């Protein structure tokens, strides 16, 4: 695995190369959602408005992606910062475009254990999408009652995220912790590592 998360600058290259207009990069369900919901960039990115400074290389009728909304409010989009607020479909399309794939949950955990602190941004930055559907670990037995019912409802149509975000409680930020969301979810602090 790469020793860093995919950056805003990396993701801009994907957009500028037509990443949101090339159906061959997308899973069919993701392409349908992208089309229906008019996705053109990560969830909270915004283009420069008329009168704001724009990138010189950007055609005048297509303002550059210049801002993102964060917990600190509207902030300039910084190329070196990790890209965030991606759906699993967007993360997967980016990986295909880059000639790579999302890591499996097991690959992510093994890399985190083996590389330790060299695996930069593994915790307290962003949850990281994996290629693994959310399933129980081998030998898992659901608890009786409401807890078992709760777990069973979520073990379908979800993908695993590993790592932790700046919003994760400290006790949850460990290599073995799993998070999960539907592949269409874009609101949470999720990015990717290839």
Feature roles, as predicted:
Residues 1-106, 113-115, 181-193:
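Extended beta-strand/loop cores of jelly-roll/beta-sandwich
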Residues 8-9, 16-41, 122-193:
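Surface-exposed recognition segments
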Residues 89, 109-110, 127, 159:
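Feature representing long, continuous alpha-helical segments
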Residues 113-123:
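Cytochrome P450 C-terminal beta-domain/meander region
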């Amino acid at each position: 695995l790469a020793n860093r998360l995919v950056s805003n600058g990396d993701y801009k290259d994907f957009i500028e190369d037509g990443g949101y207009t090339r159906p061959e990069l997308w899973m069919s369900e993701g392409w349908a959602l992208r089309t229906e919901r008019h996705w053109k960039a990560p969830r909270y990115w915004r283009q420069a408005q008329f009168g704001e400074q724009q990138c010189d290389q950007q055609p005048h009728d297509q303002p550059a992606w210049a801002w993102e909304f964060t917990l600190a409010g509207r902030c300039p989009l910084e190329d070196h910062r990790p890209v965030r607020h991606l759906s699993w479909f967007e993360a997967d399309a980016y990986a295909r475009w880059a000639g790579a794939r999302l890591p499996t949950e097991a690959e992510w955990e093994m890399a985190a254990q083996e590389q330790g602190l060299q695996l930069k941004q593994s915790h307290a930055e962003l949850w990281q999408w994996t290629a693994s559907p959310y399933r129980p670990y081998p030998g898992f037995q659901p608890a009786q009652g409401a807890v078992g019912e709760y777990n069973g409802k979520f073990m379908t149509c979800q993908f695993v995220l590993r790592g932790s975000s700046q919003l994760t409680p400290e006790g949850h930020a460990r290599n073995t912790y799993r998070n999960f969301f539907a592949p269409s979810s874009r609101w949470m602090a999720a990015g990717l590592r290839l």
